[in-house]
Amino acid sequence: MARVKRGVQARRRHKKILTLAKGYYNARRKVFRVAKQAVIKAQQYAYIGRKQKKRNFRSLWITRINAAARINGLSYSRFMNGLLKAGITLDRKVLADIAVHDAAGFTALAEKAKGALAA
């Protein structure tokens, strides 16, 4: 059986990790063993960050909707309940965008929500 030397594969594997570690400081960029740990940790942070981004944006949208709803005399929960009863199905992202860029449109939505709550 032929002898297998793994120099090419090792070089390729090391190069892949060291390329991913570009922009890191000192040994985290130059030493394979340290760079590998740094890259793995960075990928973990990136994965977690992608999940947190969804939570953070939802929280931001709710805050913006709440602020605009209170200007129109409703709390966030009563506003959302009013929209549900009125049969208006807009997601929080769109509602927050309307609240920021179209105050008159949001006021109209708030009036419909108030009407649905009163009925």
Swiss-Prot record:
Q: Which Pfam families match?
A: Ribosomal_L20 (PF00453)
- One GO process term, biological-process aspect: ribosomal large subunit assembly
Q: Which residues are in coiled coils?
A: none
Q: Which InterPro entries match?
A: Ribosomal_bL20 (IPR005813), RIBOSOMAL_L20_CS (IPR049946), Ribosomal_protein_bL20_C (IPR035566)
Is-annotated flag, keyword rRNA-binding? yes
Q: Does the keyword Cytoplasm apply?
A: no
Give an example GO molecular function.
Answer: structural constituent of ribosome
Q: Name one GO cellular component term.
A: ribonucleoprotein complex
Q: Which CDD domains does UniProt cross-reference here? A: Ribosomal_L20
Sorted UniProt keywords? Ribonucleoprotein, Ribosomal protein, RNA-binding, rRNA-binding
Q: Write out the similarity annotation.
A: Belongs to the bacterial ribosomal protein bL20 family.
PANTHER family, per the entry? 39S RIBOSOMAL PROTEIN L20
* Entry function: Binds directly to 23S ribosomal RNA and is necessary for the in vitro assembly process of the 50S ribosomal subunit. It is not involved in the protein synthesizing functions of that subunit.
Q: What is this protein called?
A: Large ribosomal subunit protein bL20
Taxonomic source organism? Xanthomonas oryzae pv. oryzae (strain PXO99A)
Q: Which gene encodes it?
A: rplT
